[in-house]
Amino acid sequence: LALLALLALFVSATNAFIIPQCSLAPSAIIPQFLPPVTSMGFEHLAVQAYRLQQALAASVLQQPINQLQQQSLAHLTIQTIATQQQQQFLPSVSQLDVVNPVAYLQQQLLASNPLALANVAAYQQQQQLQQFLPALSQLAMVNPAAYLQQQQLLSSSPLAVGNAPTYLQQQLLQQIVPALTQLAVANPAAYLQQLLPFNQLTVSNSAAYLQQRQQLLNPLEVPNPLVAGFLQQQQLLPYSQFSLMNPALSWQQPIVGGAIF
């Protein structure tokens, strides 16, 4: 009997199978992902594991979709705010386009210019230099040698390196001085009118400038127009921006009426 009992135990031990412990672990998680009917009924462990895998995969896939939806909503909100701001500025921009198309185009190019964004001072200096380009191009067509000489002086002059617009304005004034001298000899009144933009007295006090002009052009006080032109040039010299920028060069310019003395 003892041998038969041992034999029966041996046979039952060889036919028995071990259930892995990992298959019992998801048993507490399965019901929250499965419908109540399937969780209550009998279902194979493999089917339950498959359903659990599908439910977990669906929950993982839903998270990026929600994030993308939130990002798209935020993007739409930003676009809406930008559109509203643009609509607020459209009337003023359209008025600027009608009044001054050049300023409108300059304003449009300002935002897209990397130099304007990086260095505002350099951009403004570049814009000032562009104002003198037509005069320089005319000088290059009329007198190429003078244009090349001016370009060489532009690179070697400390004033040109420090303040290029002032240097170019000074060079242009030097070219205008002979023509103004001839104009002063021929017509002193027109000479004073040509000096009007460069006279600081005119900008600060127009009445004093007109009084000075009437005194200079009075035939009882100055009977000779050549002497009148000379006095005009000497009295306007302290107020001229040209003499303030370079007094030595201003004194070197031809003196009107010098032949009479």
UniProtKB/Swiss-Prot annotation:
Signal peptide interval: 1-16
Coiled-coil regions listed in the entry: none
Pfam families for the chain: Zein (PF01559)
Keywords of this entry: Seed storage protein, Signal, Storage protein
Superkingdom as given in the UniProt entry: Eukaryota
Molecular function terms, GO-annotated: nutrient reservoir activity
InterPro entries, A to Z: Seed_Storage_Prolamin, Zein
Keyword hit for Signal: yes
Similarity field: Belongs to the zein family.
Function: Zeins are major seed storage proteins.
Miscellaneous information on this protein: The alpha zeins of 19 kDa and 22 kDa account for 70% of the total zein fraction. They are encoded by a large multigene family.
Protein name: 22 kDa alpha-zein 8b
Organism of provenance: Zea mays (Maize)
